[in-house]
Amino acid sequence: MTRASSFRLDATSGKARTGVIQTPRGDIRTPAFMPVGTAATVKAMMPESVAATGADILLGNTYHLMLRPTAERIANLGGLHSFMNWDKPILTDSGGFQVMSLADLRKLTEEGVTFRSHIDGSKHLLSPERSMEIQKLLGSDIVMCFDECPALPADRKALDDSMRLSMRWAARSKEAFGDRPGYALFGIQQGGLEEDLREESAKALREIGFDGYAVGGLAVGEGQAAMFGCLDFAPDQLPTDKPRYLMGVGKPDDIVGAVKRGIDMMDCVLPSRSGRTGQAWTRRGQVNIKNARHADDPRPLDEDCTCPACRNYSRAYLHHVFRAQEMISGMLLTWHNLHYYQELMQTMRDAIAANDFAGFEARFHADRAEGDIVPL
């Protein structure tokens, strides 16, 4: 990484890795899960509450922040950390995925992507240079290069063309990023599910040189089996002495499978989005708190969980406030889900340090196979 930032690999267990990404704003223990703060907030959570779950780093969305309140406004107000009251590291995505999935009337050229805002219809150009400028204005600690993320399935020619465009954009991103001591720039591997295209992409990224490397273009509709098939080779194509980031993943079993295959970092809106829709994640799997079976249940979501929702509230209460559409429902379930995710990451870090990831994985799947506790 650039000066004052580094990656230290501490232990391995099979392909699973544990270590520390050291940044001027603090250490990021890996494997790490990054809660998503789309619009400079993790929905339904105070920043100090997110930190209390054990999160070392948040993710911010370049596309959303450039449109509202604008990167220039955030910079004038002291940068994203100050703006959202988060003093730990922040990673920002490049905006490419959201442009291709959310924006209206988009046009893709060699220069970048011209699009109209989904908010007010205003016209914008997002290019490698503009993405680097926006992320610098935001002041994020880890910056992602600008790429195109094609939806799967896609034919080979489309994947090949897209990958080559992303590699040209990666080189432009690196040049535009410049020399920024203490800040890191990650490249993004593309190539769909094709091993040779992934290798060609990884080779191009290695030649450019980045502080970390993401496996991009997965979790876009291909299904878990296909994703794991790709992860059986894609992380191995990336440098071993740099962090590896799987973008947009995911469910707990996706995360465990990714770590097993050598991934160090992940992000996903799932734990917070699920919390707002009455879904809780526990070591036994998913709990739908809206179901009538919970209406008279005095037990916690998970008797072994130490989050505020499990320490202080019953399933009956959580069922009631969700059915009554009270704001505290989303707050408590989101806190629980983020706490569960961070506990999962810590358990994996401990297992890797003890060279027992296989044992952890067996226990993880055995717990989930039991299913939720029996109704009263």
UniProtKB/Swiss-Prot annotation:
Binding residues for substrate: D93, S94, G95, G96, F97, D147, Q190, G217
Cofactor note: Binds 1 zinc ion per subunit.
GO biological process: one example: tRNA wobble guanine modification
Pfam families: TGT (PF01702)
RNA binding as annotated region, ranges: 248-254
Cofactor: Zn(2+)
The enzyme's E.C. designation: 2.4.2.29
Subunit structure: Homodimer. Within each dimer, one monomer is responsible for RNA recognition and catalysis, while the other monomer binds to the replacement base PreQ1.
Protein name as it appears in the record: Queuine tRNA-ribosyltransferase
Gene for this chain: tgt
